Structure formats: C-alpha cells, structure tokens
Amino acid sequence: MAGTVNFAQVSMVLKHQPLGIWLSLALIIFIVGFGVKSAIVPMHTWLPDAHPEAPSPISAMLSGILIETALYGLTRVLYILFEPSTFQMAIAVLAVLTMCLANILALLQQDIKRLLAYSSIAQMGYMLIGVAAGTSYGIMGVFLHVFNHSLLKGMAFLAAGSIVHEAKTRDIENLKGIGRLMPVTSILSLIHI
C-alpha cells in the first residue's frame, strides 16, 4: 500500500486513503493483536488465569508493564496510521465492555490474584476511554493512568504475594483478620485501592 515500513511515511500515505477493505482489515488486526496483549474484553481471558499461576513479582511486572506496553503500542499505531474518526467508536465500545465486564467479574472472585487481574483489566478499559476520546487531554490522561497503574498495581500484587505467603491461601474468605497480622502490608494494599 505505502511501499515502505517507515511509520511516518506510511502515515502520510494512509491518512489520505479512504478506509477500504484492506485498511479496515489492518485496523481490526491491530486492535485484536494489541487487544490480546493488553487484555481488552473480549480478548482478556488469558490474564485472570496467568496471574494466579505466576509468582507475585512476575504478576507485578505482568500487570504493571506488559499490558501497559501493549496499550502504548495500540495508541501509537492507531494515532499514527489512522484518522481518529475511523477507530474512536470501536475503541469506545471495547472500553465500556472492558470496564463493565471486568468490574462485575472482579466482584465475583474469591482468589485475591484473580480479583487483582480483573481489576487490571477494568483499568485498561478506563485507559481505553482516553484513547477513544481522541483529544490531547485524553491521551495525557491515558499515560498518567498508565504510570499510576504501573506503580500501584505492581505494589498490590507484591502485597498480595506477601499476604498469600503468610496466610498460605489466596482465598479472600480465609484472609479475614490479616490486617492485624500484617499491618504494613495491609496499609500498602489500602493505598492501592
């Protein structure tokens, strides 16, 4: 289509093209590809299963770095290669679905790490709303939220790992009274929330 792989040159060519079948297909492939990595609903199913299986430091990096990196990639590709009007509605719909479904599923969890995983997915929905807004303030809000989420969700997974190590369970029902046993860790968990 553009005869080059240089993003700046591809952008100059594609932004003046009508959205035909090939550009639509490319847009869908980018959204699905980055959507899987950033755990956007309905491509989120791997993340709640990955967090309970991973050690807590890996969960902290997975939630604090990996999914945000994919969101950054999605944002860059969308805004460099496409006109915002071509993707804003689709991204907004995915954002609302991601926020709503992930929050509902988070409330139904008994495993502390699955709860945090669904919380991370919901946060991706909040960030996607900024991407869909298509304004400079929306994008600034996205990256501020990315920074905050990276720090705080990483801290939450590390705190959850300490709690699980001490309590020998991830079941939230069995963690009653853990605040008296681990006050500093519990306070750090409250800061995240």
What positions do the PLM features span?
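Hydrophobic transmembrane alpha-helices and their helix-loop junctions in integral membrane proteins
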Residues: 1-191
